[in-house]
UniProtKB/Swiss-Prot annotation:
Phosphorylation at Tyr-55 by SRC is required for enhancement of lysophosphatidic acid-induced cell migration. Tyr-55 is dephosphorylated by PTPN13. The modification Asymmetric dimethylarginine is found at R25. This is Thyroid receptor-interacting protein 6. PROSITE patterns: LIM_DOMAIN_1, LIM_DOMAIN_2. GO terms for cellular component: cytoskeleton; cytosol; focal adhesion; nucleus; plasma membrane. SUPFAM superfamilies: Glucocorticoid receptor-like (DNA-binding domain). Keywords: Cell adhesion, Cell junction, Cytoplasm, Cytoskeleton, LIM domain, Metal-binding, Methylation, Nucleus, Phosphoprotein, Repeat, Transcription, Transcription regulation, Zinc. Residues 281-339, 341-401, 404-471 form the LIM zinc-binding domain. The lineage of its organism: Eukaryota, Metazoa, Chordata, Craniata, Vertebrata.
Length: 480
């Protein structure tokens, strides 16, 4: 894109408007087929706008009525102009000014009767219209009213912009008049403010619903520190630079704002009422705050006041004392011991490991044999009819049957669990004691060749039994 070409002044040729179009005061002329020319005013110097600086909104028909720039920099459509006025001449300038002033008053007066919110009133601005190039032709001291971008802070602020593709040309001082609100807008009337400076570069006015009427009539403010300024050669449109400018402002009093306000009040209250000392948490006994150094103790993964950390049974304070925790409850030593099981042998509380047998609790050292007093922890045992505890050996020695020959207890063999004994003539015998009383022959319990042949209460083998029988028979014969 090439920069504008500045031609020397020539004899001005009257430019003509198309049929049915009128040029209001201060508006740009219609486009021409040749390069843009400049007709200097005897009192005011003008800087022409190059054709590439004019913005044509997409989708907007070209045949629109003239526009004027409000105090927000928002283009407003002027209604009611005659369709065919011809070229504006210096002689009709005063009448044109009066007509425009009357139309503006009617528009603003009609707007003031519309229902609005008590705090702010929103309106929709019609889309702007811009001519594509042309010549500036001020007449009769008329001052053009440029289209200024909507400002974030309400006040009109003319600024100079240099696009990246167009070199900055010579600056011509220009008096720029900013349109001010008239009566009927619900705001105090103010005088027109003036500012000197070069004409602004291309801009894109905000025409969305997010613009609020009356927001731009605040006092002139300096830009806040949180609003960045655009770099030279780059124009940031109003509304944060988002496309289209449709960014409606959120209504007041939404839940996030209420939540933020509540949290802020809570923070202010907490800061206004600080604790008197260091805060350690809530007491596990009474639920109150534990504040101050030395005011609490930590136990059972909780914080307690000194007076709240007591025994669950006798309510004695446990600070600096040994305590026992049972199911997240603290006990002093005496109360804890009272809750323990007692040994069935010595009747003392069991503080260490518990050994249970036959439904009773024992100290491991108290669970012993009543005969040999050997500890039976992990060793097989048995009990008698009176529930006395015996080891297996002592139980057999005490309660096993006795051998009729040796008189010893008949017990299981080492490594065996069963007891083997021989019963004959209602007497019990060890296997090794079951012998013939005459010859000492080891008898067998099977009843075969070396079986027992009892005779007159004696245990005899077969031979000895026969000899005894013959001897008795001879004696009987002799007696006869």
């Amino acid at each position: 894109m090439s920069g504008p070409t500045w031609l020397p002044p020539k004899q001005p040729e009257p430019s003509r408007l198309p049929q049915g179009r009128s040029l209001p005061r201060g508006a740009l002329g219609p486009p021409t087929a040749h390069g843009a020319t400049l007709q200097p005013h005897p009192r005011v110097n003008f800087c022409p706008l190059p054709p590439e600086h004019c913005y044509q909104p997409p989708g907007v028909p070209e045949d629109r009525g003239p526009t004027w720039v409000g105090s927000h920099g928002t283009p407003q459509r002027l209604q009611g102009l005659p369709p065919d006025r011809g070229i504006i001449r210096p002689g009709s300038l005063d009448a044109e000014i009066d007509s425009l002033t009357s139309m503006l008053a009617d528009l603003d007066g009609g707007r003031s009767h519309a229902p609005r919110r008590p705090d702010r009133q929103a309106f929709e601005a019609p889309p702007p219209h811009a001519y594509r190039g042309g010549s500036l032709k001020p007449s009769g001291g008329a001052v053009p009213t440029p289209m200024l971008p909507a400002s974030h802070y309400g006040g009109p602020t003319p600024a100079s912009y240099a696009t990246a593709s167009t070199p900055a040309g010579p600056a011509f001082p220009v008096q720029v008049k900013v349109a001010q609100p008239v009566r009927g807008c619900g705001l105090p009337r103010r005088g027109a403010s003036q500012a000197s400076g070069p004409l602004p570069g291309p801009h894109f006015p905000l025409t969305g619903r997010g613009e609020v009427w009356g927001a731009g009539y605040r006092s002139h403010r300096e830009p806040g520190p949180g609003v960045p300024e655009g770099p030279s050669g780059v124009h940031i449109p109003a509304g944060g630079g988002r496309g289209g400018g449709h960014e409606p402002q959120g209504p007041l009093g939404q839940p996030p704002e209420e939540e933020l306000e509540r949290l802020t009040k809570k923070l202010v209250h907490d800061m206004s009422h600080p604790p008197s000392g260091e805060y350690f948490g809530r007491c596990g006994g009474c639920g109150e705050d534990v504040v101050g150094d030395g005011a609490g103790v930590v136990a059972l993964d909780r914080v307690f006041h000194i007076g709240c950390f007591v025994c669950s049974t006798c309510r004695a304070q446990l600070r600096g004392q040994h305590f026992y925790a049972v199911e997240r409850r603290a006990y002093c030593e005496s109360c804890y011991v009272a809750t323990l099981e007692k040994c069935s042998t010595c009747s003392e509380p069991i503080l260490d490991r518990i050994l249970r047998a036959m439904g009773k609790a024992y100290h491991p050292g108290c669970f012993t044999c009543v005969v040999c007093h050997r500890g039976l922890d992990g060793i097989p045992f048995t009990v008698d009819a009176t529930s006395q505890i015996h080891c297996i050996e002592d139980f057999h020695r005490k309660f096993a049957p006795r051998c009729s020959v040796c008189g010893g207890a008949i017990m299981p063999e080492p490594g065996q669990e069963e007891t083997v004994r021989i019963v004959a003539l209602d007497r019990s015998f060890h296997i090794g004691c079951y012998k013939c009383e005459e010859c000492g022959l080891l008898l067998s319990s099977e009843g075969e060749c070396q079986g027992c042949y009892p005779l007159d209460g004696h245990i005899l083998c077969k031979a000895c039994s026969a000899w005894r029988i013959q001897e008795l028979s001879a004696t009987v014969t002799t007696d006869c």
